[in-house]
């Protein structure tokens, strides 16, 4: 029988590979030439040399190593924060699966494969599925932590 830490690790691994696999499959289709255009959203191929909104693109090839260090550092931190990891294995699986997928792009393609271009009413930065999964994972984590704190405060009152 698995203990809760082992169960959380399995959930983390499963979500990690699901997000990583879906992201890489979509990127493969984009790299093979899939395109779409509409009045609101286009699917186009762009290699992002930076991070969000092309920030830090001046770091060029060094950015991927910085990201690896950040991912490894966060993973080591989480392994020491067992309760945090157990409570948020899904969210961390999403963030790590997406993050590793984007870092892999940097090694294989020289930049992150971005493709969703929203341009209805205003131009938004081009992004990908992994970016969305990072945002959703962090957003759910923050919401759950916020509501957990509120619940704890009510119990203490």
Swiss-Prot record:
The chain crosses the membrane at residues 10-30, 36-56, 58-78, 84-104, 122-142. Keywords: Aspartyl protease, Cell inner membrane, Cell membrane, Hydrolase, Membrane, Protease, Transmembrane, Transmembrane helix. The active site is at 114, 131. It catalyses: Release of signal peptides from bacterial membrane prolipoproteins. Hydrolyzes -Xaa-Yaa-Zaa-|-(S,diacylglyceryl)Cys-, in which Xaa is hydrophobic (preferably Leu), and Yaa (Ala or Ser) and Zaa (Gly or Ala) have small, neutral side chains. Pathway: Protein modification; lipoprotein biosynthesis (signal peptide cleavage). It is an enzyme of class 3 (hydrolase). Pfam families: Peptidase_A8 (PF01252). It comes from the Bacteria. Its EC number is 3.4.23.36. Its main location: membrane. One of its GO terms (molecular function) is aspartic-type endopeptidase activity. Belongs to the peptidase A8 family. This protein specifically catalyzes the removal of signal peptides from prolipoproteins. This is Lipoprotein signal peptidase. It comes from Helicobacter pylori (strain P12).
